[in-house]
């Protein structure tokens, strides 16, 4: 399920968080977030909604590689081989978050928000996302242009869009 911002461009983060809450209630889902470059922005958006404690118990901000390993169970070999900004790392992040929290659906985000830190392989604005649970994950790589703040805000939106799209798909809505 590849996500494009185009189809969601007019939906605010607040509206996405509200829709996420409705979708969680409709499906009985609980959600978690394992965040790196967004620094807790997804958890903040979710918990801005009154009653979000019904479906959001915990989130993880694992900015350093050591935190990814300690909090989420990301393997040292994964980080050494693929790096923090990779499909493999976000898969392990979301699996660990769901395993630890018991959530039925999670999102993991790791990227290069800038202004420095980019490379030819992973330029500034490269963000990897994984949605899923401790058994199965879907990953997507997106290039989100802009300043550090713009990249981070766009990543929060994309993370929420992915959660909403997956839950609304489960409940039969498109």
What is each model feature region?
Residues 1-174:
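Short alpha-helical segments enriched in small residues
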């Amino acid at each position: 399920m590849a996500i494009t911002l185009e189809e969601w461009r007019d939906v605010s983060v607040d509206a996405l968080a509200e829709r996420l809450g409705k979708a969680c209630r409709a499906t009985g889902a609980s959600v978690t977030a394992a965040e790196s470059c967004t620094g807790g922005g997804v958890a903040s958006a979710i918990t801005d909604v009154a009653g979000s404690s019904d479906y959001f118990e915990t989130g993880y901000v694992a900015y350093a590689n050591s935190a990814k390993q300690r909090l989420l169970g990301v393997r040292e070999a994964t980080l050494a081989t693929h790096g923090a900004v990779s499909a493999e790392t976000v898969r392990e992040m979301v699996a660990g978050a769901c395993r630890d929290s018991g959530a039925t659906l999670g999102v993991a985000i790791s990227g290069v928000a800038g202004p420095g830190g980019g490379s030819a392989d992973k330029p500034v604005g490269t963000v990897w996302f994984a949605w899923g649970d401790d058994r199965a994950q879907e990953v997507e790589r997106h290039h989100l242009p802009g300043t550090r703040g713009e990249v981070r805000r766009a990543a929060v939106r994309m993370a929420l869009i992915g959660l909403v799209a997956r839950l609304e798909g489960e409940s039969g809505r498109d």
